[in-house]
Structures are given as structure tokens and as C-alpha cells.
Amino acid sequence: MSEILCTICARGGSKGVKNKNIRKINDLEMIAYSIIQAKNSKLFKHIVISTDSEEIAKIALKYGGEVFFKREAHLASDTAAKIPVMRDALLRSEEYFKCQFDTLIDLDASAPLRSSADIIKAFETFCQNQNDNLITAVPARRNPYFNLIEVQDGKVVKSKSGNFTTRQSVPKCYDMNASIYIFKRDFLLQNDSVFGKNTGLFIMDESTAFDVDSELDFKIVEFLIKEKNLQAKDF
């Protein structure tokens, strides 16, 4: 049976929304949603939290996350990319648990609107298509062929050229929602991008488009969770 590691990466120094990973939405800290969803999926023996914050670590432990290392400062800066953080968590986990994981599934702590069913279906898609890695996305509300623009040399131009006059006629585009990342071990260790020759895509519901990077994002996510009256059992 394959060994699947779940990682949840949550640093303490969030700038757009202060302490966002432990701010409460509907009586649950934001990071708690991802931990509960991971547990409810029944896919994981280990749910490992990568954080530089003692407060985040304490709260994660309360909900069943495993915290056995402190993320190093260079991996917790504003400029730190996420793939090295996930790679670090994988290697530390293999050393700690004395095993080798075949697959890593990362749940973004700032994207609490997924469900455990989303995690399961994304993993099933990954396995069925024999992908090296998989990303999640939602149908894009804006399209570079139609209504996204750039300013080049002082002139306003479409982001991508094309003679399209209706939204229905343009090629389908998707908006990465940063909710779920799945990697084969070797792909994660050997690549610094989520885009490869055999990258899979799992399309999620439009309501999962929001990951919390601003106060407006937080208010929208809070509204959606409260509007649906979502509780821990619902994930």
C-alpha cells in the first residue's frame, strides 16, 4: 500500500491578513479547517504542519496535526517559494517517521472552502491519470483572450491576441485556486515548478476560488462559510 503524506504549510508572518492562519471563522481557526478535512478524508496516517510559529503549532496540535520541527527562517520569509517548503517537510517527515512516502498531498491553510470529498476526488484523478503531479483550479471568471488587458509601451492591448467577440467563444481558461497540490515523491524532489510534462488538473467548484490573501478575501470566505452554516462535520 502506498504511503501518502499530508502537509499543511502555515507561516506566522502573514502580511495581507495578520495572523490569518489562526483567525477564527465560525468558531474554528482557519488552519483547523484543513486539518479536519484531511482527517475526514481518511487518506492519511500523518498530517504534518510546517510552521515557524509556536502559536500556530499549538493550535494545529489541538486539532490533530503533527508538529515535530520548526520551519527555518529562510523558508518562512515573504519571498520563500512554496515548493522548497513542501520538499523540506517531506524530507523531515521521512527522517522522523523512518519511512519513504510515495505521494505528498499539500492542503493550503488559507483555502478552507474545500471539502474532504474534494481531496479524495483529486487524489482519485491523480491516480487514474497516472500523473506526476496535480494542481486544482476553478473555471476562470476572466479570460486573457477576451477581457484581460495589459499596457505595453503605453498602449492598452489584450493579454492574448485573438478575434473573439463573445465570452462563450474563447478557449476555456482556469484559475488556480491553490487549494490542493499532489506530487509523486520524485517529481517534488526534482522540480521547482508545479508545471511538468504530466501535470494533472482537478477542477473544483467556483465557490472554492477564494484563498485568503487580503481582508476582503477573509470576509468573503467568512460569509460563504457562515452562509452555508458549515461545521467541522460538513468537511
Curated annotation (Swiss-Prot):
Gene3D superfamilies: Spore Coat Polysaccharide Biosynthesis Protein SpsA, Chain A. It comes from the Bacteria. Pfam families: CTP_transf_3. CDD domains: CMP-NeuAc_Synthase. GO terms for molecular function: N-acylneuraminate cytidylyltransferase activity. Required for biosynthesis of LAH modification in the post-translational modification of Campylobacter coli flagellin. Belongs to the CMP-NeuNAc synthase family. This is Post-translational flagellin modification protein B. It comes from Campylobacter coli.
